[in-house]
C-alpha cells in the first residue's frame, strides 16, 4: 500500500520488517533496494544489493550501489571488477558508452596507473557535446599532467550545459592547486559562454579525488536522463543518488537529484534536498528558487515567495533568476511582491527587439495586478505599453484586446486586436475563444459559435470557454446544448463563475448572467 501511494519511507520500513522475517527473499530485497534509493538510505540499499548479488541477481541498480560502496571504501580492485561486469548479466548494458570509460579512468587515477585518460579514447564526444573531453582534462590534471589538461581545455567548446558545469569544476580545481592563471583563463571563458546562468549561481567546488570525480560523472548522467524527453526516471534517480553519495558537496548533483525526485513524484524528498542545498548558499541561489517553484505548484504561493526572497529584501540582478521568480511572485497575495520583481526586471532589460517579448509580458503582469484590484484606468496605459513592446505578439494582442472587450470599451479596436492575435496563432484555444466571444458580444453570434466550438475541442475542460460556448448556444436558440456546456463549465468553475452558471442552469441566460 505504501509503495502504491508513493510513501517511500513507509514502504521501506514495511519491507525491512518483512525482510527480517524472510531474510532470503530476493523479491523483498529488490523492492527494498528500490525504496532505499528513493529515500536515500545508503546502508539499506547496500545491504539489499549485496544479498541480490550473492543470490545471482546481478541487477544494474544493485551493481551501481555496490560500485559506490567499493569506491567509498577505496577498494579499487573491487570497483574495477564491478565496472567490467558483462552488461548483459545486469539487465542493462549502458557500461560501454556511458559508465565504464570515465569510471575506469578515475579508478586508474586513484590506483596511480599510467595514462588513465586512455580509457576515454573510445568515448570521444556525443555530437557537438564535448563533456567527456572536459572530464578528460580534469582527469589529466589530477593524474599530474597539468600542461596536457590546459592544452586539452583550450581546444574545447562550452556549447552545452554539462560542458560548462564540468569546466567550472576544472577551473575550481586549477584554483585549488594554486594555478591561478589557468583558473582565471577558464573562468573568463565561462563568463562569456551561452546558457541559463546556472554555473554562475552555483558555488562549484574543485574535484579533489577519484571518488568525487566518479560522483560528479554519475550526477551528470542522471541529469541527462532527467532532461531527455522520454528518459528513464529510474536511471535518473539511480545515477543522481549514487552521485550524491560519492560527492555530497556537489551543488549541481544536489539540483540534479532534486529533479530526479520530482520526476519520481517524491516532491517532499526534492524539497528536503533543495532546503539543504540552500543553507548558506546566498541570495538568488537556484536551490531556494526551485524549492519556491515546487511549493507554488502545490498551492503554497506565499510560503514559496518567502523561501525565494533574499533575507535582505534586495532582489538580485540575475535576469534568468528574476524571470523564473516573477512567475511565482505574480501569484502572491501581496501584489507588491510581484510589482517589485517586475520593476527590477524592467530596469535590467533593454529596449531592443530581442527583449520586446519579455518587456511586453512584464507590462501585462503589472496591468493584470491592477485589473484584479479593479483599477482599470491604471491598467490601461500599461496594456498600451505592452503592445508597444510586443506589437505583433499574439498573446499580448489577445490579452489587451480581450481585457477591453470584457469592459465593452472601444469594441472595434479591441476586436481588431483579437483578430490580429488569432491570425498570428490560430491553433491557440484561448485566443480562438477570445475571438469567438468577441464576435458574440458584438452581435455576430453565427460567426462566433464555430470558433467557440473549436476552442472547446482544444481545451474541453476550460470553464471560461465552455461558459462562452453555452451563452452563444443560448443566443442561437440551441438551449439543450447551452445547458450541456454550462454544466461542463460548472464542473471546474471558480466561486465567482459558479453562481452565475447556477443561475443560468436554473433560469436560462439573461443580460445579468451573460459572461463578461
Model-derived features with residue positions:
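Alpha-helical, heptad-rich or low-complexity scaffold/stalk segments
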Residues: 1-75, 90-92, 138, 142, ...
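Structural motif corresponding to the intra-repeat A-B loop/turn of tetratricopeptide repeats
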Residues: 5, 39, 73, 111-113, ...
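Generic helix N-cap/helix-start motif at coil->alpha-helix transitions
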Residues: 7, 22-29, 44, 56-65, ...
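Alpha-helical repeat scaffolds
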Residues: 14-16, 42-54, 76-90, 113-126, ...
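Residue-level recognition of tetratricopeptide repeat
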Residues: 34, 68, 102, 106, ...
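Solenoidal tandem-repeat scaffolds enriched in leucines and small polar residues
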Residues: 107-148, 152-153, 163-165, 169, ...
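Terminal, low-structured helical/coil segments at or just beyond the last alpha-helical repeat
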Residues: 211, 463, 475-516
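Alpha-helical adaptor scaffolds
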Residues: 293, 399-457
Amino acid at each position: 500500500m505504501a509503495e502504491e501511494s508513493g510513501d517511500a519511507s513507509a514502504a521501506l520500513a514495511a519491507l525491512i520488517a518483512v525482510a527480517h522475517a524472510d531474510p532470503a527473499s530476493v523479491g523483498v530485497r529488490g523492492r527494498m533496494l528500490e525504496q532505499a534509493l528513493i529515500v536515500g538510505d545508503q546502508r539499506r540499499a547496500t545491504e539489499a544489493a549485496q544479498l541480490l548479488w550473492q543470490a545471482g541477481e546481478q541487477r544494474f541498480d544493485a551493481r551501481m550501489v555496490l560500485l559506490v560502496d567499493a569506491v567509498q571504501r577505496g577498494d579499487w580492485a573491487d570497483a574495477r571488477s564491478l565496472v567490467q561486469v558483462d552488461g548483459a548479466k545486469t539487465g542493462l548494458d549502458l557500461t560501454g558508452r556511458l559508465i565504464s570509460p570515465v569510471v575506469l579512468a578515475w579508478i586508474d587515477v586513484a590506483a596511480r596507473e599510467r595514462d588513465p585518460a586512455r580509457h576515454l579514447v573510445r568515448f570521444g564526444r556525443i555530437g557537438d557535446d564535448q563533456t567527456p573531453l572536459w572530464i578528460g582534462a580534469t582527469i589529466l590534471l589530477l593524474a599530474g599532467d597539468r600542461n596536457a589538461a590546459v592544452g586539452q581545455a583550450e581546444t574545447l567548446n562550452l556549447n552545452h550545459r554539462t560542458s560548462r558545469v564540468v569546466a567550472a569544476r576544472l577551473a575550481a580545481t586549477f584554483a585549488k592547486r594554486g594555478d591561478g592563471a589557468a583558473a582565471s583563463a577558464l573562468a573568463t571563458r565561462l563568463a562569456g559562454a551561452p546558457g541559463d546562468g546556472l554555473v554562475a549561481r552555483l558555488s562549484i567546488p574543485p574535484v579533489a579525488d577519484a571518488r568525487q570525480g566518479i560522483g560528479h560523472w554519475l550526477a551528470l548522467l542522471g541529469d541527462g536522463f532527467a532532461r531527455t524527453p522520454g528518459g528513464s526516471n529510474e536511471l535518473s534517480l539511480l545515477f543522481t543518488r549514487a552521485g550524491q553519495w560519492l560527492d555530497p558537496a556537489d551543488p549541481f548533483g544536489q539540483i540534479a537529484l532534486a529533479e530526479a525526485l520530482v520526476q519520481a513524484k517524491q516532491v517532499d524528498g526534492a524539497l528536503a534536498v533543495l532546503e539543504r542545498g540552500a543553507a548558506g548558499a546566498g541570495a538568488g541561489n537556484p536551490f531556494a528558487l526551485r524549492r519556491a517553484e515546487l511549493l507554488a505548484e502545490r498551492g503554497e504561493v506565499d510560503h514559496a515567495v518567502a523561501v525565494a526572497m533574499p533575507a535582505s529584501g534586495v532582489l538580485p540582478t540575475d535576469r534568468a533568476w528574476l524571470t523564473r521568480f516573477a512567475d511565482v511572485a505574480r501569484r502572491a497575495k501581496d501584489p507588491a511582491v510581484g510589482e517589485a520583481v517586475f520593476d527590477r526586471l524592467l530596469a535590467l532589460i533593454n529596449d531592443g527587439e530581442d527583449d520586446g517579448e519579455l518587456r511586453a509580458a512584464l507590462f501585462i503582469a503589472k496591468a493584470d495586478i491592477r485589473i484584479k484590484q479593479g483599477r482599470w484606468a491604471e491598467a490601461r496605459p500599461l496594456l498600451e505599453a505592452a503592445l508597444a513592446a510586443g506589437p505583433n505578439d499574439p498573446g499580448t494582442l489577445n490579452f489587451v484586446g480581450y481585457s477591453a472587450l470584457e469592459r465593452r470599451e472601444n469594441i472595434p479596436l479591441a476586436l481588431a486586436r483579437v483578430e490580429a492575435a488569432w491570425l498570428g496563432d490560430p491553433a491557440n484555444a484561448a485566443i480562438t475563444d477570445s475571438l469567438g466571444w468577441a464576435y458574440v458580444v458584438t452581435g455576430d453570434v453565427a460567426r462566433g459559435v464555430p470558433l467557440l466550438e473549436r476552442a472547446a475541442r482544444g481545451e474541453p475542460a476550460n470553464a471560461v470557454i465552455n461558459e462562452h460556448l453555452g451563452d452563444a448556444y443560448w443566443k442561437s436558440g440551441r438551449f439543450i446544448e447551452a445547458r450541456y456546456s454550462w454544466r461542463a463549465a460548472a464542473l471546474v468553475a471558480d466561486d465567482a463563475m459558479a453562481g452565475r452558471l447556477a443561475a443560468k442552469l436554473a433560469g436560462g441566460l439573461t443580460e445579468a448572467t451573460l459572461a463578461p
